[in-house]
Amino acid sequence: MSSSTGPAPASASPVQANRGNSPNILPLLYTSQLGMDSQTICIPSPYVEACQDYSPPHGGEISHGALTLYSPVSSPVLGYTHPPVSESLVPLNSAIFWPPHPTHSTPSLHCPSPLAYRETHAHTTWEDAKTHINQSSSVLTHAKLLGQQLDGDDGLNPSPGILGKGDTHFCAVCHDYASGYHYGVWSCEGCKAFFKRSIQGHNDYICPATNQCTIDKSRRKSCQACRLRKCYEVGMMKCGVRRERCSYRGGRHRRNPPIRDSSGGAIGVRGHSQPHLEFPLSPTHPLFPLGDRAEGCGQNLSPEQLVNCILEAEPPQIYLREPIKKPYTEASMMMSLTNLADKELVLMISWAKKIPGFVELTLSDQVHLLECCWLDILMLGLMWRSVDHPGKLIFSPDLKLNRDEGTCVEGIMEIFDMLLATTSRFRELKLQREEYVCLKAMILLNSSNCSRLPQTPEDVESRGKVLRLLDSVTDALVWTISRTGLSSHQQSIRLAHLLMLLSHIRHLSNKGIEHLSTMKRKNVVLLYDLLLEMLDANTSQSSRMLAAHTKASLRMDTQQTTEILHTSKQQPALKESNQDTRHSPQAEGTVDKTLHRVDKTLHRVDVDTD
């Protein structure tokens, strides 16, 4: 007889049904040795053997393969310490679940220890995260960056009745009750089936409106295009598309191969739970580790290992799937470009979290870094896709534009020309993929170095982490260039040429932000939620910097004006008429009015800035 480590199938045998209906299973599994009291909550981990089709047990059905538990008390990610509980592992005889078979050998089970999660503990790390969420002035919320819903319905911060009637798992797409953890997120059966059909090829949906339809429990069937977009936004992904996104089952089976008994049946071996296993990390569950490679800080990896990690973090290609009808119009062109940008932003957040060391930064720093460089990264990706296509911009495999095709959009031709020129320079340098991914990571980590000064010791420490990560990525780029076979002098020149192009990309990004803001102001195109928040974050940040610059300039002008006025009062008069004018009450009144007006302007700028 073989045992399975996954949830029991629907067509279970009577013996398996008896296992599920056996009374008092949990008291037998978890004895009093663990010190669990009545207020202890056992939270089923969403990452089990079948990650995309896991359904939490309902009623009396208990699947011993799905009772992997986790807790922030012992999570290395959250910084908690907990005494080892390996001594509490209780080897169980299979007779607890089903009677012994007369002919087959009975497998022995080794149940993983539960990790107690008490609601009464002071969870410092989570409280700090919530403080960031409440106090942050950023338009891009931390919940959007890391997928953590503020109302706790994602399962990371469950209510005390998580195992009973108070189950608070809701579908991340339509907010209906979730039937399980499917394709990387908690979702209902309807959205699970819809996403499954869509990734199998039935995804040529077109929104009849403006691609901003509301998707909820009552309106989820009204627009398939917006529903699919919402699925991607919340982090649903096809398991097995990329190697680093392979299922948890595949990773576990590589480490724990099944043992065959004498009858040829596979006996599932379930040992100690391993905290660093590769599993699909969606934006809805940011606090789980990414694996050994991404868990450690980037400076602990060799340059070759770091380059490989960044290469594997690259997101997949995105398709528009909604061909633009020719001739192009300003509205249709901008709608397609913003649609692609919004999809890329969703994947960009997942990509950033896979950069080694990025998730170890504070939430506010993660948000700020992405806010400062999102368009730079999008434009660098556009150049990389276009480097082998002279004279064309490859926004996606199904959206390739010539220079002249951008004439329908007002003000975009200058940006197109700059994009083509920078892409041509990358083509001349024969940019390699390893160099491209290193430059991309450098843009992310270097984006906020000069945007604000650290105010607190925590800010200084966090800034140090970012700089150390940036140094590691820089070393990785230098190592990549050293493998080209060039001389040391030529390697230095190539490094300088590549880094100098980053300033051109930043200039392009500023032009793009300005143009996108103009299109938004003219109501040419309606922006999607995430793209709109990113744009507003850039706009508000630019306004703050402009206000600070204006205030400094006004103060300087005031000081210079005061010095000039005092100097002019002390200079001897060359003419009698000038002397009379200088001592006249009317002239002194004019000077006083000028100083008063400048002081009033300074005060108004101070108020606006505050």
Curated annotation (Swiss-Prot):
Q: Where in the cell is it found?
A: Nucleus
Region annotated Disordered sits at 566-596
Q: Where would I find the NR C4-type zinc fingers in this protein?
A: 171-191, 207-231
Tissue-level expression = Predominantly expressed in pituitary, telencephalon and hypothalamus as well as in the liver.
From its record, what is one biological process in GO terms?
estrogen receptor signaling pathway
Record-level GO cellular component terms: nucleus
Sequence segments annotated as region (Modulating): 1-170
Name the PROSITE patterns on file.
Answer: NR_LBD (PS51843), NUCLEAR_REC_DBD_1 (PS00031), NUCLEAR_REC_DBD_2 (PS51030)
Protein task: Binds estrogens with an affinity similar to that of ER-alpha, and activates expression of reporter genes containing estrogen response elements (ERE) in an estrogen-dependent manner.
Q: Which family does it belong to?
A: Belongs to the nuclear hormone receptor family. NR3 subfamily.
The entry's protein name is Estrogen receptor beta-2
> What gene is it encoded by?
esr2b
